């Protein structure tokens, strides 16, 4: 369909769907720094050219939890450029906006704000990269929401129970129920689904007349026993699921035969990991919804940097490489050079006729050197391609896989055998490393009071969210809780008995996962509150508080400049913003200037010594210490619908058949037809070959639901 197709009438929703844009990814890289912004510009331009009703984002709009000023500025600039204007919004919102956007200071959709002139509304959930953090649980999307550019929905305020209330939209006779669930740690959400703590609310009136669209940002592929969300967990009244977080582009809706809904995985719009899933061509989707029918048109992204990957197993070429040959390294280098040149030639051929595509491609050659071979110097080899590829430092990746006990003669499956580094998008997580360490550590270094899970969560907060006080607050909180337990039990002050009671108390907490979750949340909230207090205290200093003798400062700078070379190329004498004689710590760190005479320091030597002493106290010492800190406290579907997948930009239209014609034919043999099942009536039209299209089958049974 073209943007001016007559079937795009007042009853048809046109929605641009995208996920995982990752604005700011590698923004400091000289070659790839602007890739995310250029592609985001293309996505918004596609929305404008296709005259969509709104844009739907599936999380991870930003790559960093705390995006830089450049990233925020570029994002706001593009949203203002494309999403503001005089074009009227053709649909209305009929749900309670105070429920949909209740966590915002402006609990209404942005295009209904009289102070804003929005032409293309943007609805977005948050992902795991830009999720809410801090004492106030804010994220970068909340900044965009407050500015009036994004409608942030799908946010859960509770960690015990999730009630998903839909945003109800109507355009003409078409009713769209938009459900969203921002990123939640997979293990926690998995447990909530198992315990029936996730509820998707439905409209009270005429619930079967709504097209139900659900946006989620979780692991779809299985990374562990509970580190993913099975599609079977989702309610079966859903019609289409937009699945974010997974970067491989599988935007064509696929049918879940158990729940009988469709899943579309748009994938990322930028290559963030040099892994096989990222080699798939990137697309966004133009979703049309009319009544109970839908059509998904794939729109290729033409500004995405090319990415080519190839695997080489040296042992598979015995005629070319002999490990005992002293010149085998030179032969391997020549072979790798030839492979990379082939990929560069392929990139050049594909780039012809597309001036929007970046000139330098991403190239990755993975070399398995098992069998007695030795890797060569990758950095020296990569210097040949500095001016030709966008990733010269990691063009080649050497690896070895462990020898298998039994040879099956099958081809090597790199996805199963390769131990990928973190740079290739593996799911290596901090809390898993902590758990693995304590599982393999010797007995004398095992935790006796703290829990592995709590420590893992605290370290993850420290690494991912830069919560510098997370570990310290967790230790203090669990120590306080243990002390209270021992006091309540009136344990004798015998070291052996106290150690035994502490061990039992720790084991009981480990068995009670809910209690341990509460401990971690309380400790993290205390760490965030402490950081917020430190930030407020740092920002409370005025120019009068930090004033000093300009003459002394100038003399001091003059002396320093004669005796030492500055280590940073920053200007001197910055006034109230701080020169070399000042140092401000925005997060509560040390604020000691050099020769300023202010004596402002939040953590002097004495405090460090005290902290070190308290950390080294044993359990018995802590218990005996007299100084105590205060404690801190489903309906049956009887409708039919039509779903189409458009693989090209050619004109196509919604089927004009009657309601009876939209139902599946019952002539094709099927084992399930004898079970009195009714068809959901989902039909696909595609430009691909019918033999390869799983949606063009003559019959698709549907069972009756209770």
UniProtKB/Swiss-Prot annotation:
Its cofactor is Mn(2+). There is a cross-link at residues 339, 481 (Glycyl lysine isopeptide (Lys-Gly) (interchain with G-Cter in ubiquitin)). Residues 569-579 have a biased composition (Basic residues). Its EC number is 3.1.-.-. The modification N-acetylserine is found at residue 2. It is found in: Nucleus; Chromosome; Chromosome, Telomere. It comes from the Eukaryota. It holds the Pfam family Mre11_DNA_bind. Residues 643-653, 684-694 have a biased composition (Acidic residues). Core component of the MRN complex, which plays a central role in double-strand break (DSB) repair, DNA recombination, maintenance of telomere integrity and meiosis. The MRN complex is involved in the repair of DNA double-strand breaks (DSBs) via homologous recombination (HR), an error-free mechanism which primarily occurs during S and G2 phases. The complex (1) mediates the end resection of damaged DNA, which generates proper single-stranded DNA, a key initial steps in HR, and is (2) required for the recruitment of other repair factors and efficient activation of ATM and ATR upon DNA damage. This is Double-strand break repair protein MRE11. It comes from Rattus norvegicus (Rat).
